[in-house]
Amino acid sequence: MVRRLRGDCMEEVERAKAVLKENNVRQVLCAFADVRGYLQMFSIPAREFVDGSAFENGIGFDGSSVRGFRTIEKSDMVWMPDASSLKIIPWIDDPIQKSAIMFGNVYEAWGTEIADCDPRGYVAKRYEDMLKSEGMSAIFGPEIEFFLFEGVDFTRLSWDMWVSPNGGAGDSWGPPRIMPISSELESGYMIRPKEGYFRPPPEDTTVEYRNELVYYLEQLGIDIEYHHHEVATAGQVELDFKPKQLVDVGDAFYLYKFAAKNIAAMHGLYATFMPKPLYLDNASGMHTHQSLWKGEPFSGEAVFADPDDEYMLSQKARYYIGGLLEHAKALTALCAPTVNSYKRLVPGFEAPIYICWSPRNRSALVRVPMYVKKPSAIRVEYRGVDPSCNPYLAITAQLAAGLDGIKKKIDPGDPLLEDVYELTPAQKRELGVGELPTTLRDAIDHLASDELMQEVLGSHIFDAFMELKIDEWNQYCLYITPWEFMKYFDI
């Protein structure tokens, strides 16, 4: 008998069938994520869900063709639909192309048990269910940043003979690099590097795109709280949506990226979630706000809130922060999982590289926002995340680290109220402020020695992730960059 983790009640299935029929949907895009965090998708005619047995039996596929899933001799797997996640794709009007998207969990052969390679069903859903069994819940609000480019040519390099990355110290040239195309770099109303934050049009060339993206995201059930141009030039933007629980926030992340890329393509543009595409400008992050609740979010008790505390923080919130700091180095492998991620985690670009916590202070890895002084608004923000991550893994790992802090009563120490970037190395040592890993290789080494993270991922995903990331690092180490030719050719 087929077991489903989510959306298996007849009411949800019948609702989904009605939505498909009422909207004359022709195709359903069946979605899931691989271990790396890449969205995977295949199409099934809607009639297979409305009149056929796709909801009951799922859809079989080749798991050996998905990175990190199965080897060829064990390749038969079953995608089981989550009827509650069905959404009509709102920008498709052509009746021939009319489509919906639905997430699902991945099962082993015959559809009898959840596959331990599935980030959504095996990792995120498992932890969400664990919280519910204890009468608890958690919500997460990621601040997803990305760039909107007009074009990019991977075969063309730009360079500047007289530009110094060190303000005149050391080398006096800017290395050859790929330079994306953006009118924000070329027009009379150009935005200079690091001067894009909250810029209005006409300097901000992305506002009409953002307005359109908000329109479609809200039809997909993603309520946007606010959006704006970000710090970097060349079309860096941020759109923040209201917080969601663990599985739903992962689904929303993928819907967000799917919509952002498709709306961009409709206008001949390119949306990229690559963390650091621009040299000497800010990178894209995904600061993740989170809070714990007894019962349901907002209607239950806010676990992190204590009205009598100076920062409105309960002792459990402090222990939660302690857990995040304790596991920060291992978390970095999951939260910043690409070689490019570590071009973001450097001083001088508003990135959190120091392991400490603080209220209001954006130089700390963990920040306690101080906007609204009421229990339901009290939360912690983990800033060491970027949008190249797999949210089902990265956000679940943050939750697990925080819960481990509560379980073990890990004291985070006093908050650091100074600008950490301005402290001397001696001052940081005296205060016990550590640093995040500086390369992907360092991060995966820390992940390898963290037993909690191994428990969160399970042995299969842990081993697959390690293998994929070690291979990625080795590929990078073999590549000879244009910078090396500029630096060393005349030795």
UniProtKB/Swiss-Prot annotation:
Q: Which InterPro entries match?
A: Gln_synt_N, Gln_synt_N_sf, Gln_synth/guanido_kin_cat_dom, Gln_synth_cat_dom, Gln_synth_gly_rich_site, Gln_synth_I
The reply on keyword Secreted is no
Quote the record's binding site residues for L-glutamate: N282, A283, R344, E350, R362, R383
Where, in this chain's numbering, is ATP bound?
E225, H289, Q290, S291, R362, R367
Residues annotated as binding Mg(2+) 1: E143, H287, E381
Query: What reaction gets catalysed by this protein?
Result: L-glutamate + NH4(+) + ATP = L-glutamine + ADP + phosphate + H(+)
Q: Residues in domain GS catalytic?
A: 119-491
> Could you say which EC number(s) this protein's record lists?
6.3.1.2
Cofactor(s) this protein cannot do without = Mg(2+)
Q: Kindly list the cysteine pairs connected by disulfide bridges.
A: none
Domain GS beta-grasp: from-to ranges:
23-111
Per UniProt, the keywords (alphabetical) are: ATP-binding, Cytoplasm, Ligase, Magnesium, Metal-binding, Nucleotide-binding
Entry GO terms, CC: cytoplasm; membrane
Quote the subcellular location field of this record.
Cytoplasm
Q: What are the binding positions for Mg(2+) 2 in this chain?
A: E145, E230, E238
Details of cofactor binding = Binds 2 Mg(2+) ions per subunit.
Instruction: Quote the SUPFAM superfamilies the UniProt record gives.
Output: Glutamine synthetase, N-terminal domain, Glutamine synthetase/guanido kinase
Which GO BP terms sit in this record? glutamine biosynthetic process
Q: Does the keyword Cytoplasm apply?
A: yes
Q: Name one GO molecular function term.
A: glutamine synthetase activity
What domain of life is recorded for the organism? Answer: Archaea
Describe the task this protein carries out: Probably involved in nitrogen metabolism via ammonium assimilation. Catalyzes the ATP-dependent biosynthesis of glutamine from glutamate and ammonia. Beta-glutamate is a much poorer substrate than alpha-glutamate.
What family, per the record? Belongs to the glutamine synthetase family.
Its assembly, as annotated, is: Oligomer of 12 subunits arranged in the form of two hexagons.
User: Could you tell me what this protein is called?
Assistant: Glutamine synthetase
